[in-house]
């Protein structure tokens, strides 16, 4: 959805959302928790938003709530930019997003796991595009948010290793497959990269894969 800023109410932003060709715009609320830290919300500015909720309000009718921080917005943006996703040859398997990090010293970041239905299609390359053209469109819309696109794998060890990109992993030990607990060995020079600033990289990798990940020096 494309939404336009029309006014400010307390900490929320009221936006006008296009409801289709020839139809009037409808109002939607963008709550504070769903805003992005790098957005500049000013009157008549337009943004891509994700429709998060429609609730019935007594005497007011349906109330729309939209989000800029929801992982669904990232999916929506990639679907718009990547023809292979639209055609079904590439699919988004999982998304882990930290749009509002707990500390200001850490920027927003998202990890996206992708897979291809057709063997000859490179799903990561399709999402990144020639010279990064496709992913750059998504990054621009999210005001510079860092996005890691990684290859999904049925092999949990390979999937965990991929999820820690851009760090280089030497070995993944699935110490408790039933409890989804893994130890990951990385070279000493890759340790800080694998963990990420204030633990952001490993935190997102854990959320993406569903595994508890302990990182150790090899």
Residue ranges, per PLM feature:
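RNA-contacting regions in translation and RNA-metabolism proteins
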Residues: 1-218
């Amino acid at each position: 959805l494309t939404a336009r800023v029309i006014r400010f109410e307390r900490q929320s932003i009221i936006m006008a959302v296009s409801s289709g060709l020839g139809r009037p715009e409808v109002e939607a609320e963008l709550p504070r928790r769903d805003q992005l830290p790098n957005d500049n919300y000013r009157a008549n500015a337009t943004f891509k938003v994700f429709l998060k909720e429609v609730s019935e309000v007594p005497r007011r009718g349906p109330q729309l709530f939209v989000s800029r921080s929801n992982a669904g917005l990232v999916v929506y943006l990639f679907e718009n930019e990547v023809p292979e996703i639209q055609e079904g040859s590439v699919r988004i398997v999982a998304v882990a997003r930290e749009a509002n990090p707990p500390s200001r010293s850490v920027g927003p970041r998202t990890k996206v796991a992708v897979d291809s239905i057709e063997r000859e299609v490179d799903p990561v390359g399709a999402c990144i595009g020639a010279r990064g053209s496709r992913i750059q469109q998504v990054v621009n819309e999210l005001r510079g948010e860092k996005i890691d696109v990684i290859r999904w794998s049925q092999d949990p060890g390979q999937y965990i290793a991929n999820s820690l990109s851009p760090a280089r992993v030497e070995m993944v030990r699935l110490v408790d497959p039933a409890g989804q607990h893994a130890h990951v060995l990385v070279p000493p020079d890759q340790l800080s990269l694998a963990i990420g600033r204030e633990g952001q990289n490993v935190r997102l990798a854990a959320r993406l894969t569903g595994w508890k990940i302990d990182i150790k020096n090899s």
